[in-house]
Amino acid sequence: MKTITAKHLWSFPLLFGFLGAIIGLVLRYAFTGSIANFPFKFVLHSHSHVMLLGLLFNALIVLLFTRFTNGIDKTSYLLYIALQVCVAILLIGFVLQGYAFVTILFSTIHLWISYWLVIRLWRHLKGEKTTIVLIKSGIVFHFISSIGPYALGPLMALKMQTSPWYQQAIFFYLHFQYFGSFFLWMLAILFQKTTISLSKTQIILIVTSLILLYAHSLKYSFNHSAIQIAGSIGAGILIIALFKLKNSFLHQKLQYQLLFGTLLFIGILNGLGSIPYFSNLVVSNRFMLIAWLHLLFLGMYVPFIWIELNQRISKKTWIGYAFFVLSSEFILVFPSFFSELFSIAIMWLLFLAYFGIVLCISIVHLTALFQKN
């Protein structure tokens, strides 16, 4: 078997990231009303699965295997390739039929293969003890998050698609991926690269905060003081834990300082989300939810992946990307203001902002895909 290079492994998240971004742009264009009889839900499922599994999960898995093991072995590589086949089928399947037999089947197969792959990763891990603990905690969260998808089948069989539990099954999965396994894996890679070491207490605090922050998702379906208190405690712990790392990042490269600033900002926003006024605002406004998810994905994870890609990205591309991401966030949070300011329908404004984002993603990903070395 040929030597498996990092470039070869990276080709899949780069390609799926590009395709997922294009699908998202088509979706944004369709929201302007320019495409008749457009299957919004089908395409949305395709976009979200490709970006979550095809870009983010793939990229983090590649980074973990290349940074914390002696390299990906043959069996793990074959499992990785099997995951790519699943993502490709999901990309097409969701567009054609939405959630149906084929997409449910291959979503499940992807999940089962990912179990096998992360177990192999666990067995081959090497490196500084605290970062290994973060990675293993992330793997545990990966297993925990899958309770959400497994609950969807029984809920559908019971015709409970409109119940709050169906929505919470989805939120449970997303939270323990975005703010569970992915978050901890990102921190492990970040701390290894910056040679920042955490104490056992700091790790426990961070993991505890991420568990408690699921309460913010529960707020979408239930209104109880205990949920508010749990979310507040989780946000408070995370903010304190991040603030204690502030001095360690002051001596790092600018790109890591900015990334840490983004982490801290997201921690503070979690704190604001614990205040009833702001939490109720987000719960009642779908644009706010989209803004939050895009902030995590486009504002934190994508820049992190680009930094770790070891690909030279021009300052103009970085500035352009930051401008368009921030523009899209402000438009989502203050839609009426910007619609009146520019006298343009809000969906067209969002399309223009996302066009800029997709252009930047295309430049970075296609350049990395076709570079010779």
Locations of regions flagged by a protein language model:
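Hydrophobic alpha-helical transmembrane segments of multi-pass integral membrane proteins
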Residues: 1-373
